[in-house]
Curated annotation (Swiss-Prot):
GO-annotated biological processes: translation
Protein's name according to its UniProt entry: Small ribosomal subunit protein uS9
PANTHER family in the cross-refs: RIBOSOMAL PROTEIN S9, SMALL RIBOSOMAL SUBUNIT PROTEIN US9M
Keyword line: Ribonucleoprotein, Ribosomal protein
GO cellular component: cytosolic small ribosomal subunit
This protein's record includes keyword Transferase: no
One MF annotation (Gene Ontology) recorded for this entry: RNA binding
Length: 130
């Protein structure tokens, strides 16, 4: 393990996260803000910490994240994906446990586009028989 810094790119919905991990004390910084300050909801914070808790490295790595686009849920998911990729770069033997938890796979679900003649992506205008 020659590298002192490990990198992973994570994506979810329209969010993209660039994650840098290095050996440290467990600080997580997102866009120059501490994790607790950046995400108001506890669920988002929990999602970000999931891969670290799974491999029991919560207090062994410092995580520095730059995230753009999307909302809270998308950004949290993108950060989780990025942290997972950085962990795999750090130690490839973590891949099976991370894959079993479902963190390695990129969640490809995106918002479906609105179609012409419909009110939303699939919602049709109200139909009146008479």
């Amino acid at each position: 393990m020659a590298a002192t810094q490990y990198y992973g790119t994570g994506r979810r919905k329209t969010s993209t996260a660039r994650v840098f991990a290095k050996v440290g004390t467990g600080n997580i910084v997102v866009n120059q803000l501490p994790l607790d300050q950046y995400f108001g909801r506890e669920t988002s914070r929990m999602v970000v910490r999931q891969p670290l808790e799974l491999v029991e490295m919560t207090d062994k790595l410092d995580i520095f994240v730059t995230v753009k686009g999307g909302g809270n849920t998308g950004q949290a998911g993108a950060i989780r994906h990025g942290i997972t990729r950085a962990l795999m770069e750090l130690d490839e033997s973590l891949r099976p446990s991370l894959r079993a938890a479902g963190f390695v796979t990129r969640d490809a679900r995106k918002v479906e586009r609105k179609k012409v003649g419909l009110r939303k992506a699939r919602r049709k205008p109200q139909f009146s028989k008479r």
